[in-house]
Structure formats: structure tokens, C-alpha cells
């Protein structure tokens, strides 16, 4: 859109984070299907196939035992319920397993605020698809938003 002759770019936070990680970070050069998962107050997702974003996915709303996944496996829930890393990893593993069976991805990239502590839960995951930490951690969305805006100019 244009406002006062300037372009305005809208991007979901997880999509923006995924753009950054695919261009400069953990997903750079990765073939196949890559899923960016942002874990914070909710769960955000960005899905890339062949390096192209499939925009506006909302798989934080995937059902997990009668609740949205983000009400079971987000970082906010981990903190609210004071879950141990082992219990949190078990919940996150269930979510990633469901995503794995839906998409058969080649890579999961985990970002968001909790990514700074990924060494405490990623080693506890037991899915087939590799899971790596976002290179830009919680700043990936900022970098990706700048990329999206730059692309529009």
C-alpha cells in the first residue's frame, strides 16, 4: 500500500523472522521445506518451500488435546506453568511431531525469545527432522521486516 507516496509493507512476525533466517541465517541455502517456528507469547510459523515463503500460516492454532498449540507449547505457557525443560521439551516435541507429519520438512528453525535458551530443550527433542536455533535469535523479525521493506522499494 502507499501512504503519502511511500510504500507500506505488512508482514507477520514469523514470516519476517523466516525471511531473515532464509536469506542470512540458519536456513540460508537450505533446499526443500523449511519451517520457522517462533516461540514466545504464542507460536508463530513461516513455511518455505524451495526458498519461497508460503505466507500467512497460523499453525500455532493447530489442535493439541483440545487447545491451540500455542496454549500448550509456547514460551509463555512454559513460564506460566513453571514447566521444567524436560516437560516443556515433551510438549514442544508433540507439536513439532504433528508439524513433521503434516509437512515432512527438511529443517525446523526455532526462534523467538526462548531461542536464547535452546541448548536447554533442543537436545531433548526426539523428532526425525533436524531442529536448529535461529541465527538471529529473537531479532530475526526485525531483520526480516527490514528485508521486506527494502524489497518493496
Sequence positions of predicted segments:
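ATP-binding/phosphotransfer module of carbohydrate and carboxylate kinases, centering on a glycine-rich
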Residues: 2-6, 20-39, 47-153
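General beta-strand structural signal in soluble alpha/beta enzymes
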Residues: 8-13
Amino acid at each position: 500500500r502507499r501512504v503519502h507516496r511511500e510504500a507500506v509493507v505488512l508482514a507477520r512476525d514469523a514470516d519476517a523472522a523466516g525471511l531473515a533466517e532464509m536469506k542470512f541465517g540458519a536456513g540460508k541455502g537450505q533446499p526443500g521445506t523449511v519451517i520457522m517456528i517462533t516461540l514466545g507469547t504464542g507460536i508463530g510459523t513461516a513455511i518455505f518451500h524451495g526458498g519461497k515463503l508460503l505466507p500467512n500460516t497460523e499453525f500455532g492454532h493447530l489442535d493439541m488435546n483440545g487447545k491451540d498449540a500455542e496454549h500448550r507449547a509456547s514460551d509463555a505457557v512454559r513460564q506460566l506453568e513453571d514447566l521444567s525443560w524436560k516437560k516443556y521439551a515433551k510438549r514442544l516435541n508433540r507439536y513439532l511431531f504433528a508439524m513433521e507429519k503434516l509437512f515432512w520438512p527438511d529443517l525446523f528453525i526455532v526462534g523467538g525469545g526462548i531461542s536464547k535458551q535452546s541448548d536447554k530443550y533442543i537436545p531433548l527433542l526426539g523428532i526425525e527432522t533436524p531442529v536448529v536455533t535461529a541465527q538471529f535469535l529473537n531479532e530475526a523479525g526485525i531483520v526480516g521486516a527490514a528485508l521486506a521493506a527494502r524489497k518493496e522499494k
